[in-house]
Each structure stands twice: as C-alpha cells, then as structure tokens.
A protein has these predicted regions:
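N-terminal helix-turn-helix
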Residues: 17-20, 24, 28-82
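Short alpha-helical segments that sit at the start of domains
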Residues: 1-16
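A short glycine/serine-rich beta->alpha loop
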Residues: 2-3, 60-65, 221
Length: 246
C-alpha cells in the first residue's frame, strides 16, 4: 500500500521536478540543480528542506557519495500515481500500412506491433497473444544496453532468465492486466525478483476469441509519459487493424 496520498502539494511538485530531472540525467539531483533548472522562486535551502522531508517519508534516498538524492520505488510510485504529471495527449504517428495491403497474419500483427512500440518508445517491447502457448515475444533488448542501470551484464542475464524461464507467469500477468487500460508496475510490484529493479508498463486489447497484451520494460527511471503515450497509440492502431482484418 502506497503512502504517497499523504504527500503535500508543494512536496509533490518538488518530487515531480526531482524525478523529471533524474529521468533525464540519470544521476543524483541536488537542490541547487532544481533551483537553477526550473528557475524556482525560492532558495536552495527551502528546496533542501523539502528534500529532507521527502527522504524521511521514503520518497527519496540520499547517496552519501553525493550531495544529491535519487528517487526510491515509493517515490516513483507517487510520481506515477499522485503527482501532477504533464499530460502528453499527443498521439504518436504510427505507420502500420503494411496491414492494409493484405489480410495480416497473427505473426504479422506481432512483428509490426513490436516494431512500432520499439520505434516510438525506445524501450524493450514485449508481447503475448492468446493461443500462442506460453510464449513472450520481445524486441529491442539493445535499448537495455544503453541504460546505465544495466551496465552490469549480470542484470541482463536476469532479464533474459525471466523472459525465457518464466514466460507462463509473465504471460498471465500480461493478460490479467489488459482490462486495466494501461497498468504501470514499478519494482517489487512486478512480482519477479529478477526484474525487481525495473518498471513494466502494460496494455492490450481483447477481440472475440483473441487477447493481445503488450508491454514496455525498462529501468524505474523510465519516461512514463512517453511509455504510456506510445502504448496508447499502438493500442488504438492495433484495435483498428483487429476490427478490420482479424
């Protein structure tokens, strides 16, 4: 159960700015950085005091090798669930015109959906389709290599282990999440120890006897606005395709 509902408006605002900066910079964020970047009408001491409060509430962690702070899992949950995020309502333009040339197979749908998700989001894309045993299709693992969180090759091994050995359980998680619209799972919420330092953003749709579930996997420091907008755009385009051809 998250405690983020107790956070005050000013603290929520500063937490959002800290996490926005951390997503962009991938390094501890200081009070001076926040004041300078966002031209806030308050002193660095005021921001520092708020950061101390956020740390006491469990939303930030202080790295003693740095004067800055980084978000905790609880901080990211608050950011996603309660912070006033800028609503990115713009739908990304998706070209899936290859569907229109002829009736696509399920394999075509899977391939083009994964390609579109990778292209739009820049994150590793996963997909499951009902009736395809317990298989998880994925694309874009190279994007994991670009994230500093996964410089340790052992972390990538853990991810591959989950995708290959725990496909059935992962597929169940995907299909259970379809009716939620877009579901964001952060860290331990995913339920798999091997990827407990990641985030998973899931969407999908059901049509007649078929269920399509797709997701984006990345570090907790992922761009959630971009991830959710990418999934929504792909879901809308896939829905049109399914209704017309499948």
């Amino acid at each position: 159960m998250t405690r983020s509902v107790d956070i005050k408006n000013r603290e929520r605002e500063i937490l959002g700015l800290i996490i926005d900066s951390y997503i962009e910079e991938s390094k501890p964020i200081s009070s001076a950085y926040i004041c300078q970047k966002y031209h806030l009408a308050c002193s660095t001491a005021t921001i520092r005091n708020i950061m101390v409060l956020l740390e006491k509430q469990g939303f930030l962690s202080h790295l003693y090798t740095s004067s800055g702070r980084v978000p905790t899992q609880e901080g990211f949950r608050c950011y996603v669930e309660n912070c006033d995020r800028q609503n990115d309502s713009q739908e990304y333009s998706i070209s899936l015109d290859s569907y229109a040339s002829s009736q696509p197979s399920i394999e075509d749908v899977i391939s083009h959906t994964l390609d579109a998700l990778v292209q739009l989001s820049g994150y590793t894309s996963l997909m499951a389709v009902s009736g395809r045993d317990e298989k998880i299709f994925f694309r874009g693992m190279r994007f994991m290599l670009e994230q500093p969180e996964f410089e340790d090759v052992r972390r990538l091994k853990d991810i591959f282990y989950t995708l290959e050995v725990k496909m059935g359980a992962l597929q169940n998680l995907f299909f259970d999440s379809i009716d939620d619209g877009i579901r964001i799972l952060i860290g331990d919420d995913i339920g798999f120890e091997e990827i407990a330092d990641c985030s998973l953003v899931i969407s999908g749709l059901r049509d007649k006897d078929l269920s399509f579930a797709f997701a984006l996997l990345g570090p907790m420091r992922m761009n959630y606005n971009k991830a959710t907008s990418s999934l929504q755009s792909v879901r809308n385009r896939l829905k049109e395709t399914v209704e017309e051809f499948i």
